[in-house]
């Protein structure tokens, strides 16, 4: 075959293949190869003689039917192979002799094609807007610019042969240039003013070629658009906003895999603020409680009403009756209705607070004896209702800050937090991860716990270790067999600890030993499984022991005085504040705690809590030690019986062999169960000992002494008033209080003495 004829058949087929690849999700390497093939294809395609100086192929028309080259020549009835090149003089003479023929339909189709893109970047005020996507509609783009460029200056999915100064643009694929990205566009975009839009004339609308070409982010969504989102310090950034199911998702760019912000609409209040003299844009304000979490700017009132309609539909409870046809969102009001309601609240609150004193205050103002005006009256631009709302927001933020500070201070004692690498937009980022209430929170830093970057509800999820040989300590969190998050630990112990904690928080019955581990050797696998088992058993025991979160003052009730002699020996706690025998040894008689039937269950914050904790942990420790000894004895008996069975199997290879083997298997299963129970007891015993040490560490500072278990023979030999051999730690403040005033240094109290002297001089 002729080489030219082969190229003539190959080029349109390659062009069609590239257009089909536009609709598929490709990896970065495959995408680079496809772009390289496209550039080579552009350089190899034959150019029409002296008619076109560059090549333009619109792949939007190539997704089905004949190729682009075939469509140009499908209506010619002549044989193209018989055509030959004519010399220039003959061509000019033919052109002068014959009039210009009428254009065929195919040539008219060629002339109707959109002109090629300019060889310069678009102006600074260029921006693109995605129309709202309703049910059964295809996504659409609106391209807007102030210049007088042709109407179809931007098409979806094209290949061009232009200068290197013009960056390649792909609207439907993964690759986008800097001026089409949402972060860069947010700085060049100025306003949503309707006056400017009216002066621009009709805007061209370009639809995506097919449903297959739509982005994966907007599939199965109720509505989507590129909207302006208000940042922290008042700037506006364009982001892809999507409503899926009952959540609002914000993406910084259409190529992102994870949303930058995820907001549950059923727990938010939405307020629509129309455009007026004070507000330059139509705004939707989303709030949780008294905190405003998101502000979105819309282009027109119709667009805002459409978004509000979708939010109302999403917020309705599923399967509700007519009486329950109220949206779950607490507030869904317009700004005018909100101001009206706030003004009514202001009038009622003013009438309630002033009461009958209005006439007196009016008379006082008329005579010039009224009080000074409040801050809101001096400002003049802020109503009392708005002031009260701001005060509530400030007080709420302070309360939240205090709670978060307390929580941050206690993070060292909680083993359910730490740094993990998180895969975000094809890149790893270090995040402070924290487990709380069956939810995994991601924070930018451990010092900033007030706001979280993302949160994952773990109930119903699964965990799967492994993410390739380059990341042996990575693991994935799956929900309905779809990846929700990909995390990576720093070492094998850290990975095992997180796996055990996540399995407990997910409510899974799978143990860390049952998981399938890849890309690790035997030693690393042993370390991961050991750490995972320890954390799994620790978290499971904590859940069994404390089914509900306990506050610091929540202690069990104290036993009555008539039940105290029934305490087990060796767990006696000396009560300096309640026993009558030790009252005489106290120097400060003012500190007393009376214990009787009416006040037996009343607790003070300090010493009584330490006493109760120490007594409870001592009892629990002894109970666990006894249980451990019992299990050890049973294990020894089972092992002895197992050895005897093995000897019997060796000596009697006959008909009883099968029965002996079954008995041996039963004994081995019992041994394994007892061994697991023993390991569980060991872990619980270690935890109880640590808590006992913590309670005893605060005991001596509060005047608490704990007697450990003493043998009866030693108590008979030693007198009762014997001083302990090792000195107990002493609290300096309590010792100074016990000293007599003569021992205290005389230079104390000079400041008060001087103050009294000055007062005497003044009088």
Curated annotation (Swiss-Prot):
Single GO cellular component term: stress fiber
Highest taxon in the source lineage: Eukaryota
Keyword annotations of the record: Cell junction, Cell projection, Coiled coil, Cytoplasm, Cytoskeleton, Phosphoprotein, Repeat
Annotated PROSITE patterns: PH_DOMAIN
Disulfide bonds: none
Start-end of Basic and acidic residues biased regions: 582-591, 754-763
Residues modified to Phosphotyrosine: 552
A family per Pfam: PH
Region (Disordered): 83-137, 169-210, 343-380, 561-604, 712-763
Record localization: Cytoplasm; Cell projection, Podosome; Cell projection, Invadopodium; Cytoplasm, Cytoskeleton, Stress fiber
Biased composition (Polar residues): 175-185, 712-724
InterPro entries registered for this protein in UniProt: AFAP, PH-like_dom_sf, PH_domain
Coiled coil segments of this chain: 606-694
Protein name according to UniProt: Actin filament-associated protein 1-like 1
Gene: AFAP1L1
């Amino acid at each position: 075959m002729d080489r030219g004829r082969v190229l003539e058949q190959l080029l349109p087929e390659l062009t069609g293949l590239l257009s089909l690849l536009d609709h598929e999700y490709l990896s970065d390497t495959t995408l680079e190869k496809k772009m390289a093939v496209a550039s080579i294809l552009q350089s190899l395609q034959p150019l029409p003689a002296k008619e076109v100086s560059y090549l333009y192929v619109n792949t939007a028309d190539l997704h089905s039917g004949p190729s682009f080259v075939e469509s140009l020549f499908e209506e010619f009835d002549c044989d193209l192979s018989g055509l030959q090149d004519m010399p220039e003089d003959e061509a000019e003479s033919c052109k002068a002799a014959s009039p210009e023929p009428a254009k065929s339909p195919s040539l008219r189709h060629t002339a109707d094609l959109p002109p090629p893109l300019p060889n310069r970047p678009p102006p600074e005020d260029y921006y693109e807007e995605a129309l709202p996507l309703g049910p059964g509609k295809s996504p659409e783009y609106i391209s807007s610019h102030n210049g007088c460029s042709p109407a179809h200056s931007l098409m979806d999915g094209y290949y061009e042969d232009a200068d290197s100064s013009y960056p390649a643009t792909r609207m439907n694929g993964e690759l986008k240039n800097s001026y089409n990205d949402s972060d860069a566009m947010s700085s060049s975009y100025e306003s949503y003013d309707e006056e400017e839009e009216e002066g621009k004339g009709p805007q061209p609308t370009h639809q995506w070629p097919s449903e297959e070409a739509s982005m994966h982010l907007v599939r199965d969504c109720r509505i989507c658009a590129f909207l302006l989102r208000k940042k922290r310090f008042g700037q506006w950034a364009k982001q892809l906003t999507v409503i899926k199911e009952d959540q609002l998702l914000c993406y910084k760019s259409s190529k992102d895999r994870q949303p930058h912000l995820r907001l549950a609409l059923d727990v938010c209040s939405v307020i629509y603020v129309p455009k007026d003299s004070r507000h330059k844009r139509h705004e939707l304000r989303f709030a949780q409680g008294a905190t405003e979490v998101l502000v979105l700017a819309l282009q027109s009132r119709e667009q805002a009403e459409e978004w509000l309609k979708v939010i109302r539909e999403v917020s309705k409870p599923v399967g509700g009756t007519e009486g329950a046809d109220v949206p779950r969102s607490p507030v869904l009001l317009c700004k005018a209705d909100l101001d009206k309601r706030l003004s009514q609240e202001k009038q009622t609150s003013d009438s309630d607070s002033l009461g009958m004193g209005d006439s007196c205050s009016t008379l006082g103002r008329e005579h010039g004896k009224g009080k000074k005006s409040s801050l809101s009256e001096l400002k003049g631009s802020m109503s009392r209702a708005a002031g009260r709302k701001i005060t509530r927001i400030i007080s709420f933020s302070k309360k939240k800050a205090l709670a978060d500070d307390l929580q941050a201070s206690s993070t060292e004692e909680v083993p359910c937090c730490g740094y993990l690498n998180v895969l975000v937009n094809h890149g790893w980022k270090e995040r402070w991860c924290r487990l709380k209430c069956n939810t995994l929170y991601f924070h930018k830093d451990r010092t900033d716990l007030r706001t979280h970057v993302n949160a994952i509800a773990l109930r119903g999820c699964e965990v799967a270790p492994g993410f390739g040989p380059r990341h042996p300590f990575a693991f994935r969190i799956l929900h309905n067999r779809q990846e929700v998050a990909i995390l990576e630990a720093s070492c094998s112990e850290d990975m095992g600890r997180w796996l055990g904690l996540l399995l407990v928080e997910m409510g899974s019955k799978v143990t860390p030993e049952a998981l399938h581990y890849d890309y690790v050797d035997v030693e690393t696998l042993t370390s991961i499984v050991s750490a995972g088992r320890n954390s799994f058993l620790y978290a499971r025991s904590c859940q069994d022991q404390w089914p509900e979160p306990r506050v610091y003052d929540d202690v069990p009730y104290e036993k009555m005085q008539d039940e105290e002699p029934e305490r087990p020996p060796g767990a006696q706690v000396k009560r300096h504040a309640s026993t009558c025998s030790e009252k005489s040894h106290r120097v400060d008689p003012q500190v007393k705690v009376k214990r009787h039937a009416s006040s037996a269950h009343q607790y003070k914050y300090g010493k009584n809590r330490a006493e109760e904790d120490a007594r409870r942990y001592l009892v629990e420790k002894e109970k666990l030690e006894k249980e451990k000894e019992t299990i050890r004895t049973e294990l020894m008996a089972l092992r002895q019986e197992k050895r005897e069975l093995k000897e019997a199997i060796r000596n009697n290879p006959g008909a009883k062999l099968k029965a002996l083997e079954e008995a041996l298997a039963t004994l081995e299963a019992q041994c394994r169960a007892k061994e697991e129970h023993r390991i569980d007891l060991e872990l619980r015993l270690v935890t109880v000992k640590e808590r006992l040490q913590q309670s005893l560490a605060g005991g001596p500072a509060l005047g608490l002494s704990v007697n450990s278990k003493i043998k009866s023979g030693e108590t008979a030999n030693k007198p009762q008033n014997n001083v302990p051999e090792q000195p107990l730690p002493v609290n300096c403040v309590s010792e100074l209080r016990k000293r007599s005033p003569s021992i205290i240094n005389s230079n104390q109290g000079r400041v008060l003495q001087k103050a009294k002297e000055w007062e005497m001089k003044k009088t």
